[in-house]
Amino acid sequence: MILALAMLIAGILLLIKGADWLVEGSSSLAKRFGVSDLMIGLTVVAFGTSMPELLVNIVSSVEGANDIAIGNIVGSNIANILLVLGIASIIRNVAVKTSTVWNEIPLALLAVLVLQLMANDSIIDHYPVSELSRSDGLAFLAFFLIFLWYVAKMRRREDEIENGFVERGVPVSIGFVSIGLGLLLLGGKLTVDGAIDIASLLGISQAFIGLTIVAIGTSLPELVTSVLAAVRKKADIAVGNVVGSNIFNVFWIMGVGTIIHPVRLDPALNADLFVAILATVVLFIAVHTGHVHRRIFLFWRQRQEHVIGRTDGVIMLLLYVAYLGYLVWRG
C-alpha cells in the first residue's frame, strides 16, 4: 500500500513538473522563432497545461482502466468548478467577463452534455455496452476546433499583452521539452499504476480513485493558478482558466484519448456525469445572481455585474464535500 501510494503521489508530481517544463521549453522555442505571446498562450501553454490529464487518460485507456480514464476527466471538471472556484471565490469575490458568462460557460455545459449523450449507447441506441468510439473522438475534436477558432477570434479583439515568456537557448529549450515529455510519460504511468494498485488493495472501485485522488491531483495546476489569481486581484483569470480547462478536458483530451483507444463506460458513472452537468449549471446561476440559493429557492434575481461571491464559494465547497461523501457511500 505504501509503495502504491508513493507511486501515485510521485506520478502526480512528475505530471505537474513535466507539464511545467514542457510549457517552458516549448514557449522558449516559439519565442525564439518569432511566435507572438498571443499565439503561445493560445497553443503551447493551453495544450501543455492539459498534458497531465491527457497522459493519464491515454495510459489508463491502453491499460484497460476505463473507469480511471473517464473518472479523471469527469472528476477533474467537477473539482475545477466546485473545489477550485469555490476556494478562489472565498478568498475574493470573483468577477467574470461577459464573454465567459454567455459563451464559454454554456460551451462547457455543452461539452459535458455531449459527453453524457455519446457515452450512453446502451440507453440511447440499446447497444449491449456503452462506449466512446473513435468516431466519437473525431466528433469531440471537431467541437474542439470550433472552440479554438472562437478563442482565437476573441483574443484578437483584445490588446496583446506581454506575458513574460522567457527566451532561452535552443539546446536548453529542447532539453526542457525532452525532459518534460519524459516526466509526463513516466508520471502518467506511475499515476495510473498506483491508482489501480490502491483500488485493488483497498477493495474500492477504480472509478472512485479516478474521480477523487487522480482528478484532484491533475487539477492542482488549475487550483494554484486560480488561488494566486484571486490573491493578486485578477480573479477573472481564475474563471477563464477553469472553464477553458473543462472544455479542453472533454473535447481535446477525450477526443485524442478515444481515437487512440475506445473507452467503455460503467453505467454507474452516469451519476458523476450528472454532477458535472449540475456543477456547470450552478456556476452559470452563480454568475448571474451572485447567490446560488436565491435563484434555486426563491426567484431569478439578475445582477448587473457578473460576480461569484463568497457565499457562492461556500455553497460550492459544501456541494463538493457532499459529492465526496456520496462517492464514499457508493464505494
Regions found by a protein language model. Name each.
Residues 1-331:
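Hydrophobic alpha-helical segments, chiefly the membrane-spanning helices
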